[in-house]
Amino acid sequence: MANIQDFLTDNMLSNLESAASLAIHSKNNEVVPLHLLWALSVDSTSILNQILNKLNISKEALELEIKSRISKLATSSNVNRENIRFSNELINSLENAKGLMSANGDSYLSVDTWLISESQKSPIKEILAQFLDLREFQKELESLRAGRKMDSKTSDETLDSLNKFGIDLTLKASEGKLDPVIGREEEIERLMQILIRKTKNNPILLGEPGVGKTAIVEALAQRIIKKDVPKSLQNKKVIALDMSALIAGAKYRGEFEDRLKAVVNEVIKSENIILFIDEIHTIVGAGASEGSMDAANILKPALARGELHTIGATTLKEYRKYFEKDAALQRRFQPVNVGEPSVNEALAMLRGIKEKLEIHHNVTINDSALVAAAKLSKRYIADRFLPDKAIDLIDEAAAELKMQIESEPSSLRKVRKDIETLEVENEALKMENDEKNQKRLDEIAKELANLKEKQNALNSQFENEKSVFDGISAKKKEIDLLKNEASLAKARGEFQKAAELEYGKIPSLEKEVEILEDKWKKMSENGVLLKNQVDEDLVAGILSKWTGISVQKMLTSEKQKFLEVEKHLKESVIGQDKALSALARAIKRNKAGLNADNKPIGSFLFLGPTGVGKTQSAKALAKFLFDDEKAMIRFDMSEFMEKHSVSRLLGAPPGYIGHEEGGELTEAVRRKPYSVLLFDEVEKAHKDVFNVLLGILDDGRATDSKGVTVDFKNTIIILTSNIASNAIMNLSGKEQEDAVKNELKNFFKPEFLNRLDDIITFNPLGKDEAYEIVKLLFKDLQMSLENKGIKASLSENAALLIAKDGFDPDFGARPLRRAIYDLIEDKLSDMILADELHENDSIIIDAKDDEIIIKKA
């Protein structure tokens, strides 16, 4: 046995071990050639099965014949790994194959050599002859070998490399497994133009992730099947190379190179294969180790001679990183730039794949849902690209609906749970036999009868709806298959078959679908348990889960929303009508498209004394625009007073501690691209902070320390400052305006001030505003009390007293909040702790003799 192992390939040895396991399973005390043939037939990746698939021969029939013959062999009850042995017949079989191996000039015996040897004589020849033509079988085995020598134990792993390490996209296209590709005509034409060149006929598709590079290659495969390509490309096959499969399991040095070289040789020999390598930058350095070449260097000679037709695909970033450094590799590929499609182009692509998505998910997708997916994904998902993000959105919306359809309807689930609850109660009451319980048992019996009747009715309705639903889905799938068959028939010139399908079977099925859809429509009018329409609300709901932005805000008309911005701000901020009007006007200008597209939504400098509503305005704006006060990201600029602290905004440079964490500003915006950025007390910051802000205000983006560009176009930037507070407090009109301008010019650089959309002055508050602010602040206290079940109201006298006692023009509105704490909340907390206030109580907060009194209503 040891001598036999020395000349067997690893694959052959593995199959012999499988044969021994099968012999033990069959209780045969010897391993014979039949066991080895059986082992090959059950291994789906074996050479035997590859040939059976090519020749369209049933492996199940072959397996039955083998098992039938094995059942006639001698058996033993105590066969195990220790006492199983190779029969003389098998050893002779391997020795005979070894002779053929030597004649072929091989150093090791592989499975294909053994099969050729056995198909010339022996009982195995009789079995194979029942199912296939032996000459054709031997010819296919020799074709797989393609003249290669078995000079290592792993050499036969490279047989039929393209089947092992590649995916035939033209085969997938012929089976209708690829989605239709809409648009991209220019890129596909350029791709074909490069492919039919004499040399350097290798295009490389360059574009951002998700723009549709792979889809362009799939479109080429579909065109080849339909013969919609130049004559020189009509018989080509597009094979996608699976780099992970190529590298996986390559245990020994040189094994990866052997596999890749085998693939290259197969492609060169066939002359009709176009190799597609997605993420082609992975070949640079792949397999390289001390004393061995990387994959790129193996491909270069064949690429330069034009013997290897290759299409690559990678991103611009990876192309610059890997290809531009290797000039020899770069010049062997011709770039084809694939840009991000517009919203309208992405919408056309979505409409193209709509039918496939509907068939897969068994739902109907409204056109409004496609429009919403294209527009909302463009607006709200800034770090990804069309059409991928829009396709993902519509696909997930359809998946959510499919999950609902395949689950028990909520109304049916509720009835079932009610029945279960009553049955549990029924069993519990039966244990206690008294008059009161008997009365309740009678009630439960009636309720259960009603619920079970309702459950039966709902079940019946659900089954009827499901049968119509499944019928529509099955017919649509059949139509899709027939359409693909008709398309292939046309490409093959079988016009009679195409006509039979297009004018016979397909219209007949479409009529059946129409009848079922009419039936569904009538059922829908009476109310249905199953929802089968993917609409814009569902799409917006999915996007809301992704981004955290409210669904209602997405679907509200943008114009209508921004027309109301001033009104909403004035509800939250008191006494700053002029400042809020200026803020609202600037935002409306931006949203009307009168500002540059590459800038933030708005950038403002809020000036004014403390406590006048600068920060509150920013919070109110965040709440209105993004439906969440937490959408305001606040930076206390007193933390950035020193030069070294400025790097915290964009991140520490490479080599410094904290580099991997990124910048506080850039990371915050990457996580929440739709937000209000508040830079509080900006005059305290180091002057270098303003250099960082210049680029953001001008271009709407910033590059962090890791080289990642962060988009600020969906943010509102607000800077607050107490500069010129004295002038604002003590002056008014033109005099105030001039004094403020002079102080700003003395502190800020002109280029910084020029980049701001507006400088907004917040004026000091008066006693009238203080009264309104007290009423606004009291609403927060009211809500807290309502959560405890206590209703509270504030009298006018009490509000006036709090405004009088708490207002200080030098400190603005902040002392008013402290006055509410001192005058109201302290007394309320004492009453609650003393059990003087309970749930469902109502109180009135009033004032008498300059003192706040709290009384129950």
UniProtKB/Swiss-Prot annotation:
Its main location: cytoplasm. Pfam families: AAA, AAA_2, AAA_lid_9, Clp_N, ClpB_D2-small. InterPro entries: AAA+_ATPase, ATPase_AAA_core, Clp_ATPase_C, Clp_N_dom_sf, Clp_R_dom, ClpA/B, ClpA/B_CS1, ClpA/B_CS2. Residues 341-548 are annotated as: Linker. It is found in: Cytoplasm. Residues 8-73 are annotated as: Repeat 1. The keyword Magnesium does not apply. GO terms for cellular component: cytoplasm. It comes from the Bacteria. Residues 86-147 are annotated as: Repeat 2. Residues 558-764 are annotated as: NBD2. CDD domains: AAA, RecA-like_ClpB_Hsp104-like. Keywords: ATP-binding, Chaperone, Coiled coil, Cytoplasm, Nucleotide-binding, Repeat, Stress response. ATP 2 binds at G608, P609, T610, G611, V612, G613, K614, T615. The keyword Chaperone applies. Residues 160-340 are annotated as: NBD1. One of its GO terms (biological process) is cellular response to heat. Residues 391-525 form a coiled coil. Belongs to the ClpA/ClpB family. PANTHER family: ATP-DEPENDENT CLP PROTEASE, HEAT SHOCK PROTEIN 104. Homohexamer. The oligomerization is ATP-dependent. This is Chaperone protein ClpB. The gene is clpB.
